[in-house]
Swiss-Prot record:
SUPFAM superfamilies per the UniProt record, alphabetical: L35p-like (SSF143034)
InterPro entries: Ribosomal_bL35, Ribosomal_bL35-like, Ribosomal_bL35_CS, Ribosomal_bL35_sf
A single GO BP: translation
Organism: Parabacteroides distasonis (strain ATCC 8503 / DSM 20701 / CIP 104284 / JCM 5825 / NCTC 11152)
GO molecular function: structural constituent of ribosome
Keyword S-adenosyl-L-methionine: no
Matching PANTHER family: 54S RIBOSOMAL PROTEIN BL35M, LARGE RIBOSOMAL SUBUNIT PROTEIN BL35M
Cited Pfam families: Ribosomal_L35p (PF01632)
Keyword Ribosomal protein: yes
Gene Ontology cellular component terms for the protein in this record: cytosolic large ribosomal subunit
Official protein name in the record: Large ribosomal subunit protein bL35
Taxonomic placement: Bacteria, Pseudomonadati, Bacteroidota, Bacteroidia, Bacteroidales
Keywords assigned by UniProt, alphabetized: Ribonucleoprotein, Ribosomal protein
Length: 65
């Protein structure tokens, strides 16, 4: 059976934490920022975690399953 290929888009977008959770960046922070408030832009800067319902799909894309 051939090796699984890692999804190249996913490996650029997700990172693993030490405890095994998956980090992600927030969307809506690249352009059209003039109509967003300072607070919105500041909160979008922080990293988030992948939701529990999506973890299995992301792990499959990263060939961790």
């Amino acid at each position: 059976m051939p090796k699984m290929k890692t999804n190249s888009g996913a490996k650029k977008r997700f990172a693993l934490t030490g405890s095994g959770k998956i980090k992600r960046k927030h969307a809506f922070k690249s352009h059209i920022l003039t109509k967003k408030t300072k607070k919105q832009k500041r909160n979008l800067t922080h990293t988030g975690l992948v939701a529990s319902v999506d973890v299995s799909n992301v792990k499959q894309m990263l060939c961790m399953k």
